[in-house]
């Protein structure tokens, strides 16, 4: 009997491997790299979009925008109901304790991450990022406990990082051997997070940032320009054959770092800037590799949607979508994004009988089937043209010491977004071992206390007829500073006359003061003055959420005047419900 089971299991394993290999052939061979910056990019405007020959789940959605927009039923109500989520932006780059983009920056001599890497691991020609992966061990990571904490803080969904620009998959990946099950923690971290979300009835999405890995990683193909190691190549140049007898034998570094593309104009120069993508264009001498890269990109996402059933997916970028030939999509043009979306929506139809997921495409124009997102800042006015999520990290996207943890900054960030008809996802920094700092825990608990009192003004809400009122600076309403949440936001001063609005699911109007009024201070809501024309009926009731007593108020030509109770014990933002 055991022999029969073994044979069956072996057959299934071989079948699974052969299926994966048939969908994604081996990485094609490439010619030796030419001199840095010696090759012009192909013209992306004249390059016709390639249609990938990948099978997708049967259904009405086809891998083109026309079909997706025609068949998508609209953004699900659950996103508006949820409003606030936590981003689990965690992976091996936390090991460097150098903030965001540690993997790329450790290969830049003038960067703090390079200095930190030298102290912790050694020189990147000898001990590179691949070796960081091997030793990374987040042994204190407890997705169950963290999901419970995040839910207590008021979050109603999680955004879970599947793969960052470092190209290392945090699940049991079919198409990327450099993953958390094979190398490093030996854990399917995505499965652990998904199980925790199911346990606590939380929605969750998976984020994918590997679209521009191929030009992002070009620093790994360089070398020091000065010192004892000047001219000694970093480990990006290594091949499968170089691994013989080493710990990474059998793992091709090209599957992690990609290939040397510095021959194209601007690629090397842009790799050493703080951010900028290369010049728009096509890697025209590497079209076979580009096609393979795009297929692998798509198949990895489809692997997750098939086996982990996320409530939404997220792709990073700065333009209309991945593989557009410009911005972060520089290098190739193809319908990889449309292929992934069509497969995902058809799969939901097949599994559930309906579609209630969505696809986040960063900075895409209003498109039925896509949700927009952007980092840090807020629009100047209400934006109801398309559903959107505003994202930001507390401290940074990956851990570093000495972050400022301030509940008021998180709360005001949430208010600024929802008053503009948006949603929120905030990253909580996690130490390399997967734990979070005590000050961070206290911050989350304080946010949760505020949400317990004021959640009815947040969940399911929409923007009111006007964004808010208060001090005007350079012709615009004063708002919380953008950027990563830290000392700047914690020190920023509002007063009780800085006001934001939302409308609740039952039609109630909510007035948020961006600072707690002083005892018996008169707060005047000028937007409710008769000449503004915003109110369609008389005010019958004013309640202060979290306060059991009555509130003194009157309606005048100046607007709604409210006296803040002297015995109210509230923090950060007082919220009045108007009916």
Residue spans of the language-model regions?
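Positively charged n-region of N-terminal signal peptides that target proteins for export
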Residues: 1-4, 21
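Mature catalytic domains of secreted/periplasmic carbohydrate-active enzymes
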Residues: 22-579
């Amino acid at each position: 009997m055991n022999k029969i089971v073994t044979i069956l299991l072996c057959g299934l394993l071989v079948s699974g491997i052969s299926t994966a290999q048939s969908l994604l052939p081996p990485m094609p061979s490439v010619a030796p790299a030419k001199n840095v910056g010696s090759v012009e990019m192909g013209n992306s405007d004249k390059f016709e979009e390639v249609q990938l020959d990948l099978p997708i789940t049967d259904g009405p959605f086809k891998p083109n925008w026309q079909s997706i927009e025609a068949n998508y039923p609209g953004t699900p109500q659950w996103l508006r109901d949820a409003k606030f989520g936590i981003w689990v932006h965690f992976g091996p780059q936390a090991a460097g304790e150098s903030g965001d983009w540690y993997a790329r920056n450790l290969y830049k001599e003038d960067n703090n991450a390079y200095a930190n890497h030298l102290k912790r691991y050694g020189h990147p020609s000898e001990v590179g990022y691949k070796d960081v992966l091997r030793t990374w061990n987040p042994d204190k990571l407890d997705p169950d406990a963290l999901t419970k904490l995040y839910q207590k803080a008021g979050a109603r969904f999680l955004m879970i990082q599947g793969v960052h620009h470092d190209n290392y998959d945090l699940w049991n990946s079919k198409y990327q051997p450099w993953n958390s099950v094979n190398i490093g923690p030996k854990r399917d971290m995505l499965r652990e997070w998904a199980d925790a979300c199911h346990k606590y009835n939380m929605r969750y999405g998976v984020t994918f940032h590997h679209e521009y890995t191929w030009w992002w990683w070009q620093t790994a193909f360089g070398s020091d320009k000065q010192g004892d190691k000047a001219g000694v190549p970093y480990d990006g140049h290594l091949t499968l054959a170089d691994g013989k007898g080493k710990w990474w034998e059998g793992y091709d570094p090209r599957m992690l770092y990609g290939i040397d593309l510095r021959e194209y104009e601007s690629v090397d120069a842009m790799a050493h800037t703080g951010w900028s993508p290369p010049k728009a264009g096509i890697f025209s001498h590497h079209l076979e590799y580009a096609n393979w890269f795009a297929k692998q990109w798509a198949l990895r996402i489809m692997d997750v949607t098939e086996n982990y059933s996320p409530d939404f997916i997220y792709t990073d970028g700065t333009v209309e979508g991945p593989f557009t030939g410009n911005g972060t999509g520089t290098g190739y043009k193809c319908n990889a994004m449309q292929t992934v979306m069509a497969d995902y929506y058809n799969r939901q139809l097949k599994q559930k009988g309906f579609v209630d997921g969505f696809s986040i495409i960063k900075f895409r124009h209003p498109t039925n089937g896509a949700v927009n997102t952007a980092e840090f800042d807020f629009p100047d006015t209400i934006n109801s043209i398309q559903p959107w999520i505003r994202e930001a990290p507390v401290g940074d996207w990956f851990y570093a010491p000495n972050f400022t943890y301030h509940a008021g900054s998180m709360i005001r960030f949430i208010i600024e977004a929802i008053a503009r008809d948006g949603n929120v996802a905030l990253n909580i920094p996690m130490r390399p071992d997967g734990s979070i700092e005590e000050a961070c825990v206290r911050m989350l608990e304080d946010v949760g206390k505020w949400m317990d009192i004021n959640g009815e003004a947040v969940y399911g809400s929409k923007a009111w007829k006007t964004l808010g009122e208060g001090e005007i600076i350079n012709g615009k309403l004063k708002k919380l500073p953008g950027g990563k949440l830290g000392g700047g936001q914690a020190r920023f001063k509002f007063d009780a006359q800085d006001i934001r609005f939302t409308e609740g699911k039952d039609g109630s109007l909510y007035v948020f003061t961006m600072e707690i009024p002083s005892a018996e201070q008169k707060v005047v809501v000028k937007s409710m003055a008769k000449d503004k024309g915003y109110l369609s009926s008389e005010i019958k009731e004013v309640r202060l959420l979290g306060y059991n007593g009555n509130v003194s108020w009157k309606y005048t030509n100046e607007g709604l005047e409210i006296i803040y109770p002297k015995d109210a014990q509230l923090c950060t933002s007082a919220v009045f419900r108007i009916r």
